[in-house]
C-alpha cells in the first residue's frame, strides 16, 4: 500500500482518498481534501498558509533540517529482492523512526523552553514598569505589630472592676412579670 503526500499541505493520502489534478504538461498534483484543492486553485502559497506543514517548517515551528529526513527520500533505483536486505530495511526503518521521534520531541522542548524564558522576561519587565501598583504584604507589618502591642498594653492597664453577673431562670422571670411585679421588684430580685 503506497501512502502519497498532499501537494499543498504535505499530509498523508491513503489509497481511495483525495483528488488528483493533472496539468497540461502532465504534472500530477495530489490533494488530500477539497480544502487543499481549492487553496491550490486560488494559487495560495503553502509556505504562507498557517495550517500547512510547509508553513510550520518555514516558520521554525517543526524540525526541518535533520539527517533522519534523508531516509525518507524516494530512490527510483530498482533493487533485486533478497530477504536479508528486506529485514535490515525494516529494522532500519524502526530505528530511524525512534531517532526522529527523539529529535522532534527535543526540538519541541527547546522551543517551549525559549517561550518560557521570554515569558519570564516579559513578567519581569511588567513588574518593573508597574512597581507602584504592587504593595508588599509585609509593607505595613511593623506598623500593625506596634498597633497590636499598644492595644494589648492599653487593655492590661485598664483595671476596671469586673461586673458581677447573676443568672436568673427565664421561666421564673416570666411568671413574675405575668403576676404583675413592678420593675423595682425585678431589680431587687436580680440583686
From Swiss-Prot:
> What SUPFAM superfamilies does the annotation carry?
Glucocorticoid receptor-like (DNA-binding domain) (SSF57716)
- BP-aspect Gene Ontology terms: cytoplasmic translation; ribosomal large subunit biogenesis
Primary subcellular site in the record, as a coarse category: nucleus
> What would be an example GO MF term here?
structural constituent of ribosome
The record's listing under PROSITE patterns reads: RIBOSOMAL_L24E (PS01073)
**Got a GO cellular component term for this one?**
nucleolus
Point out residues bearing the modification Phosphoserine. 136
Which superkingdom? Eukaryota
Task: Name the UniProt key words of this record, in alphabetical order.
Answer: Nucleus, Phosphoprotein, Ribosome biogenesis
Subcellular location(s) of the protein: Nucleus, Nucleolus
Q: What does this protein do?
A: Involved in the biogenesis of the 60S ribosomal subunit. Ensures the docking of NOG1 to pre-60S particles.
What family is reported? Belongs to the eukaryotic ribosomal protein eL24 family.
Assembly, per entry: Associated with nucleolar and cytoplasmic pre-60S particles. At the end of biogenesis it dissociates from cytoplasmic pre-60S particles and is likely to be exchanged for its ribosomal homologue, RPL24.
This chain belongs to which protein, by name? Probable ribosome biogenesis protein RLP24
Q: Which gene encodes it?
A: RpL24-like
Amino acid at each position: 500500500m503506497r501512502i502519497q503526500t498532499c501537494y499543498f499541505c504535505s499530509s498523508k493520502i491513503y489509497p481511495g482518498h483525495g483528488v488528483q489534478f493533472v496539468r497540461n504538461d502532465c504534472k500530477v498534483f495530489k490533494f488530500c481534501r477539497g480544502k487543499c484543492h481549492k487553496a491550490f486553485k486560488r494559487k495560495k502559497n503553502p509556505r504562507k498558509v498557517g495550517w500547512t506543514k510547509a508553513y510550520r517548517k518555514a516558520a521554525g515551528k517543526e524540525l526541518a533540517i535533520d539527517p533522519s529526513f534523508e531516509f525518507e527520500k524516494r530512490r527510483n533505483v530498482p533493487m533485486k529482492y533478497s530477504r536479508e536486505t528486506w529485514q535490515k530495511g525494516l529494522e532500519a526503518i524502526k530505528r530511524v523512526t525512534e531517532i526522529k521521534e527523539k529529535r522532534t520531541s527535543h526540538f519541541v522542548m527547546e522551543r517551549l523552553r525559549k517561550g518560557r524564558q521570554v515569558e519570564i522576561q516579559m513578567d519581569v519587565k511588567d513588574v518593573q514598569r508597574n512597581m507602584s501598583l504592587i504593595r508588599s504584604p509585609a509593607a505595613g507589618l511593623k506598623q500593625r505589630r506596634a498597633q497590636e502591642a499598644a492595644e494589648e498594653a492599653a487593655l492590661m492597664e485598664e483595671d476596671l472592676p469586673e461586673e458581677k453577673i447573676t443568672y436568673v431562670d427565664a421561666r421564673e422571670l416570666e411568671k413574675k412579670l405575668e403576676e404583675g411585679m413592678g420593675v423595682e421588684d425585678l431589680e431587687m430580685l436580680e440583686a
